Amino acid sequence: MLFDQIASNKRKTWILLLVFFLLLALVGYAVGYLFIRSGLGGLVIALIIGFIYALSMIFQSTEIVMSMNGAREVDEQTAPDLYHVVEDMALVAQIPMPRVFIIDDPALNAFATGSNPQNAAVAATSGLLAIMNREELEAVMGHEVSHIRNYDIRISTIAVALASAITMLSSMAGRMMWWGGAGRRRSDDDRDGNGLEIIMLVVSLLAIVLAPLAATLVQLAISRQREFLADASSVELTRNPQGMINALDKLDNSKPMSRHVDDASSALYINDPKKGGGFQKLFYTHPPISERIERLKQM
């Protein structure tokens, strides 16, 4: 059951990434069709933009991410309990020892960052260290180490980059339509009098309008799948599903973080640091903790 869940989550993530690339290609084709008379040309430009966005975000410095979240680096002497747990989990996962940071915040939370295991780092809040017992801390750090081992940060970064590229292209198309670019193209098409041209025009406009929302939803779906995968992978490392369940239960009852957390960093944390309600739940980067616990109970 454990390995079935891991395989299923990986498969769903790759399907969602494929959908992402198709969305980017669709928007690029639509913009190219409407404004440069070449759908293929627009598609190529869109893929190049997405690639550049992804590269620039993947190589973002770990120091920048940690600084944005108010984290300070610790070592074996200054935080031995946390350091040794991370060391144990990294050893079991067969990855290099990540750098270790602490965030001074009473809320219970943790995250990992780094585009690959060689430059990875993990961070935990002081509140997490004060409340979690050894088994629960192992489960949380197993979750974060699993993100590193599974290259989740890189995958999530690619998803954010593709979503940003799609939004940028759609916004650019909107401004061009505002200044009359689409109107000139439409006039040319009307003179051609081709029904297929009209259909293509409508489809292109719909793609430009709806793609940013679709991209956001796909990005969130990828983030949720990686959380499920990291939970299951943590159990694989610790061989202790109850430890993960108990940790998640405590995380669920934790208050939001006291410091401001930007949207990009929010997706990194094991527990949504903002904990909004109502309509905001549709755009959560994390699946409900109750659902995560239920999946663990099924193992």
From Swiss-Prot:
The chain crosses the membrane at residues 15-35, 39-59, 158-178, 198-218. It is a multi-pass membrane protein. Its EC number is 3.4.24.-. It is found in: Cell membrane. It comes from the Bacteria. Zn(2+) binds at residues 143, 147, 227. It is an enzyme of class 3 (hydrolase). Gene3D superfamilies: Metalloproteases ('zincins'), catalytic domain. One of its GO terms (cellular component) is plasma membrane. One of its GO terms (molecular function) is metalloendopeptidase activity. Belongs to the peptidase M48B family. This is Protease HtpX homolog. It comes from Streptococcus pneumoniae serotype 4 (strain ATCC BAA-334 / TIGR4).
